[in-house]
Amino acid sequence: MGNHEGFPVDTFPTDAERGSNVSIEWLYDSVVDLAWADNLVTEDKEMFLKNGFYTTLIQPGLRLISLNTNFCQGGNFFLFLDFSDPAEQLKWLTEQLTHSEQKGSLASIISRLYF
């Protein structure tokens, strides 16, 4: 997902910031329905639908971790509300990597980088 998919452009509220006037669910729902419906198990879909990041087991011993770097996009004014760790994604990433390390598994991280 790119930063221009949200509306207004660059606007990506976290789950905690969404309410009656702010929504990003339409985008996350569309991505899951159109692209990943058959590729993610229910738990992974639920994680993505909450804040746009997820992890999934690709094969035994290999986990894919997908980050939502849109939270860190400079134009995302929701950063003013939580600029240290939007949606606690970094905390979650640390937990995922620790879990993989403890199991002796590999983890591959994907995300979109902005230039």
What are these regions (language model features)?
Residues M1-E95:
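Extended active-site neighborhood of metal-dependent phosphoesterases/phosphodiesterases
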Residues G74-S84, T98-F115:
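Active-site-proximal segments of metal-dependent phosphoesterases and phosphodiesterases across multiple
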